[in-house]
Amino acid sequence: MDLKFTVSGRIAKSVDVVYEAVADPAQLSKYFTTGGAKGRIETGATVTWDFHDFPGAFPVRILAVEKNRRIELRWGAAPGTADADESGEPSTKVTLEFEQLDDGRTLVKISEEGWAQRPEGLAASYKNCEGWTGMLCAMKAWLEYGVQFRQGFYK
């Protein structure tokens, strides 16, 4: 059985507003990357996400983008927790999907896969599942109400 997960949530904004809140580093830094994001999400780019509550900045490789529909990325994982990518480093693949709903809201789905089939991979997948769920909640609070609540949430 592959270790992977999908989380989802609905945000009361149009798909272009929600997509841009992820693709634009200035917006992403308002509710998710507490240490800042550098680089716009575009196919082939490597951007940087930094979190005050986790050590160091993370390089994030953008594999594919379909504006207002999908973002596919790969980022590093701790040794022993994920399968190796083409460079030989442990990493997982994340897919964010955006769907405009008939009532004007946007459904966002986030899936992550590539975890190693061992206890360390399972534990790491649970932590990231928690993190992506928190990201969706923080994005909803930011876009719908202008509230930033991630700062200090994890540490």
Language-model features, listed with the residues they occupy:
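Beta-strand/loop substructures that line and gate deep hydrophobic ligand-binding cavities in soluble
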Residues: T81-T133
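Short, solvent-exposed secondary-structure boundary/capping segments
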Residues: R69-A77
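Short beta-edge strand/loop motif at the mouth of beta-sheet-based domains
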Residues: T6-V7, V17, A26-R61, N68-R70, ...
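Hydrophobic/aromatic beta-strand elements that line small-molecule binding cavities or substrate pockets
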Residues: G9, P59-A64, T92-Q100
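Terminal, regulation- and interaction-focused segments at domain boundaries
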Residues: M1-V15
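Residue-level recognition of conserved beta-strand positions in structured domain cores
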Residues: F51, W75, I110-E112
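Short, highly charged C-terminal tails/helix-capping segments
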Residues: A141-K155
